[in-house]
Amino acid sequence: MQITPFGITKNGETVRADTLRCGKNSATLLDRGATLHALCIAGTDVVLGFDSIGAYERNDAYLGAVIGRYANRIAGGFTLGGIYYPLAANDTDHGVHLHGGVVGFDRKIFCAEPYAALDGAGEGIRFTLFSEDGDQGYPGNLSLCVSYFLDAQGLMIRYEARCDKDTPLNLTNHSYFCLDGKNITTHTLQLFAGTYAKTDARLIVTDPCVSVAGTPLDFRSETSLAEALAAQSPVFEFAGGIDHNFNLDKTAPGQPCGNATLFPAAVLRAGQRSMTVLTNFPCMQVYTANFLHGKDPMKNGSLPSRHAAICFETQEAGADAPSRGEAILRADTLYCRTAKFLFAGFDA
């Protein structure tokens, strides 16, 4: 594993970059936000990112970062154990709490240490973080471990956590994927999900289980993203594209992964290239970078732009789930979830 300095934050924190390698694949992670900065498959970088820590700080797109304590949105706050916990409305466009707050996990410096597979096939890194009681308004002292492991097939992310009080927990990684270096209008998508969560103008869930049938969100068979995004449909009224939480079917054959079974969630294709998402998370927020913009150029020299990439945010539930009594980690209970991103066709 190669370790290099990446920069210094405006608060004076030193940020480092760790690069994992396995054959023709490499992954570069930043300790700020446990961020997936680059993922090169046979020489092709398939995730968006910036070249400087200043650019990451200036932009609020959460590129490649681990999100917590609560990925997605919460309307105002939540009640837990008879106590109401107000949360800051850091998404000012929609007036809601977004992705864990003003200083979510994406803006924190994690501790990093390498780890290796028992068979030696690949390289890994483990990021740990302590989130104190009251951090961004959430109850309980939370210990978090996020592990990345790179092998010849792709990248695995494992999330483990424990808290001394009941607390909402909805962890994810917010990487933006593009398989051909262009934009996602050249891609097709298949989702293993027959229902999604309907939202209001604030992107807060109003119905957590609506059929995708007859809507542009029906990706149960391989579908052109360009055609889906061009559809004139009420489902795109508030988000300007796909920014919806899908309930994963888990009906296709699963893949053993340690003590867990991972099920297909998505297949993204661009020509001969493909990425398959496997997970044991029950839900996944799919986001087509509808609000992506900015003046800082990305690694490839282009400016952040709408539909430049797509996010597969595997998670526990959709927006405002704590208000429905969902996505709650009970005190002294071990939380463990995994997501895998497998690649094919990059040598063709």
Give the location of each predicted region.
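An exposed, glycine/acidic-rich loop-and-rim segment of catalytic or binding clefts
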Residues: 1-348
